[in-house]
Amino acid sequence: MLKFITIIIFTMVLSACSNMANLTLYQQLDGKAGLERLVDSFINQIGNDEQIIHYFEHANISHFREGFINHLCVLTDGPCEYTRDSMVEIHTGMHITEADFNHVVDLLINAMNEQNIDHTVQNKILAKMAPLRSQIIKI
């Protein structure tokens, strides 16, 4: 009987892992509601950071919020279409340094940790964002 129960539990664990692997990042983040929570945490991180806040002095925060939620939705294979300005258009003239870029990544990681996002999911999100780095630094 114990062997049977062990097999059932093992099968359930494997099934749960398999189902998680089939979910998109968007689904693993709890869809739009999860993205909203993440972006709100990220905005809070930025707002409390003296090194980065100057980049947002003249920003429309609600516009940034909606745009970043939409951007993440597309990036995580959600049901969205990104129709806003490109990353080059958004960041041109901001003269973002490599140190500040890396610091913003740290703030995003802090926000993901605050939202208890699994580290595997965090790494997948960061890997999808990494190609944007060259489009953002010092343009």
Please state what every model-predicted region is:
Residues 22-26, 36-113, 117-119, 125-128, ...:
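Heme-based O2/NO sensor domains and their adjacent alpha-helical segments
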Residues 1-6:
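Bacterial N-terminal signal peptides that target proteins for export
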